[in-house]
């Protein structure tokens, strides 16, 4: 049986992920929560630009309708 999208996200809990937003913003952090709407909570969140950290946020919530993709990071 094929994996469902939320199953894949669930496997990334407590691991580092890259969250890409529709407007091109990228956040990296530890995925500590999510819901069925793809609202995500990241700990130690960092805003990236061209792969470099430009701002550190700590804990943030990203609204699911802004999310384009969620991917495990190489460090995670």
UniProtKB/Swiss-Prot annotation:
Ranges where the Sm domain occurs: 4-76
TM ranges: none
This protein's GO CC annotations: ribonucleoprotein complex; Sm-like protein family complex
Pfam families assigned to the protein according to its UniProt record, in alphabetical order: LSM (PF01423)
Assigned keywords, A-Z: Ribonucleoprotein
Record-linked SUPFAM superfamilies: Sm-like ribonucleoproteins (SSF50182)
Keyword Hydrolase among UniProt keywords: no
InterPro entries, sorted: Lsm6/sSmF, LSM_dom_sf, Sm, Sm_dom_euk/arc, snRNP_Sm-like_arc
Molecular function, one GO term: RNA binding
GO biological process: mRNA splicing, via spliceosome
PROSITE patterns reported for this sequence: SM
Family: Belongs to the snRNP Sm proteins family.
Cited PANTHER family: SMALL NUCLEAR RIBONUCLEOPROTEIN F, SMALL NUCLEAR RIBONUCLEOPROTEIN F SNRNP-F
HAMAP family: Lsm_RuxX (MF_00257)
Name of the protein described by the UniProt record: Putative snRNP Sm-like protein
């Amino acid at each position: 049986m094929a994996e469902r999208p939320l199953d894949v996200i669930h496997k990334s809990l407590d691991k580092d992920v890259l969250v890409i937003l529709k407007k091109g913003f990228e956040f990296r952090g530890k995925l500590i929560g999510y819901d069925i709407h793809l609202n995500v909570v990241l700990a130690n969140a960092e805003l990236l630009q061209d792969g470099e950290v430009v701002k550190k946020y700590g804990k943030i919530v990203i609204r699911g309708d802004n999310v384009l993709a969620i991917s495990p990071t190489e460090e995670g």
